[in-house]
Amino acid sequence: KGYRRTQKGEAEMDESVKINKIAFIGGDMRQVRAINRISESGREVAVFGFNRDVIHKMDNSVVKAENIAAIPSDIRVFVLPLPYSMDGENIKAPFFDGTITISELLRATPPESVLLAGRADARLEALAEVYGIRLIDYFKREELMVLNAVPTAEGAIQLALEETPHTLCGSECLVTGYGRIGKILAHKLVLLGANVTVSARKPSDLAYVKAFGYNALNTENLRTVKRFDIVFNTIPKLIFDRELLMNTDTNTLIIDLASLPGGVDFDTAEKLGIYAVRALSLPGKCAPKTAGEIIKTTVFDIIKEVYR
């Protein structure tokens, strides 16, 4: 049975998560944290795709499979990394000395199993259907995206502090986009004393920007960013093209938080002498422990819904 902690710290049985056996295949330190937390909750966790150095950091009760075939045959929930693959062919396993092909994994996965993968694509969806496996992209879960925005925002602030010779307090900061990351980032910047402008397109977003006391700017009217010390882009489409970069001060730091292909023409920025940083996967880099907790929580939420 699983356990959860009450506010007073006592262990209390968690009856809502009915699946007690889970396998993790590959991943980084986020997965290691999630593995340990799920194991500590009283569940059986089997893993494959990690080297000995990383395995030694896992809970003693975790089942360390030598190969995919050695994963206990009664496990029906499999968790892949975020993202599940970097090339569409192999499972992302940075702590593994070999490779784990997606086809190899799916052939060994029992039909009607549940496969949780981060950033699942059309190829994985098609293969899962062929093998009769239920695929769920946990990166699309709202709770994960909202909670992940916190370490993303903090990681962006860390980058800004490292890459600028001045404090954030009193700095002119522009946040482009007012989605999950933009909302949390703008709030944290204001708390640090920055002068924050937020650009958005939707009238409702611009209304919220004003209501929270930020300077509002319609992204459609973004013609120059010369007055800003730091720009944080969260919009996953090309915003900072050649025309806008020509109207950007060379002392302005641009931090692109948007998923690929991103929102900055990096080649042009380099030619113009503008320092632009592509900051991807910040939760796993800056706060793997917290990011692992978020994955664990999301996995449990999905299991509760699937196995009611």
What is the predicted function of each stretch?
Residues 14, 80-169, 298:
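Glycine/serine-rich phosphate-binding loop and adjoining beta1-alpha1 elements at the start
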